[in-house]
Amino acid sequence: MVLIHDAERALDVLIHQPAVDSKRITMIGHSEGTIIAPRVAIDNSTKVKNIIFIGIVAQNLRDILHYQVVYRPAGNATQALDKNHTGLISIQQIAKDPHRYSVLLRFLLPSSVVHTFLRTNNTKVIANFLLNKFANNTIEAGYISIDKQLKPLLIKRYENITAFNLLKCNNLGGCPIWYRSVDTLIPTLSIIGNVSKSTGILILNGENDTQTPVQQAFLLQQRLTDVKHPDHTLITYPNLGHVFYPSSQWETRNGPIQQNVLADLYSWLEAHSGLSHPFVTATTSAIRVKTS
């Protein structure tokens, strides 16, 4: 994978900088970077002192995509939007408040409809598209059936994505060639035992992370325990999302990393890298699981 080679080249350049202490190198990976960081550390065990995983991808890409594309939006529909537990969602309600239904609309609307709505702020374009798309609902007109219509649509979307069609690349945030390159990698969960026992490991994850769910962090923590890695710490943060900003369990909001996360990060680095200017104090509000 090209990004792994790029990271290794960057590490080599960094080590040779006069301002860098080559004996205290820490690899930090966020999201996709958590796939890259341990591989670089394994291949450069004498150079990397610590690894920090932020928003961890522990399993393979298909597991993560299934959570993002099927499990999360279907769960959002069933648990948050279907208030009357009828198994149906009103199309008029969706069109009336598209921001509330934004998690679903990402999967239901083509980009042309989204662009028209953003340009005109006319919710009728949303209602008309959905009414036409789901006109075959024989249970109740004007509604989307979660089990018979929404879930099959999400599964089909997942199957299309995981086909990794190399001929199509319609956006920057996940071209098929990138998906396929990541999909061929052995999951981090299966290689983490190859990290040197002398390498310190910190795992940080928001409990409301909708991109890399917190269960991924628990899986990695358990695996590190199983292989008897002597120095690993897991800290999870209630109500924080993928970028460690307050978020709901269904959608990550963007914003600055919260100060308690930065404080915990610095405190751990101070203890593991000998930082000499402790200008922050670690908080105790996060849920912690530590092994030493």
Regions found by a protein language model. Give the residues of each.
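Catalytic active-site module of serine/aspartate enzymes centered on a nucleophile-bearing elbow/loop
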Residues: 240-243, 248-292
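Primarily recognizes the serine-hydrolase "nucleophile elbow" in alpha/beta-hydrolase
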Residues: 13-73
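Accessory cap/linker subdomain of secreted extracellular hydrolases
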Residues: 54-194
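Catalytic histidine neighborhood in serine/cysteine hydrolases
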Residues: 225-246
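Short beta-strand/loop motif that positions the catalytic acidic residue
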Residues: 203-205, 209
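Alpha/beta-hydrolase active-site loop
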Residues: 1-16
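Short, proline-enriched alpha-helix->beta-strand connector loops that line the catalytic pocket
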Residues: 194-201, 230
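Conserved alpha/beta-hydrolase "acid-adjacent" motif
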Residues: 210-216
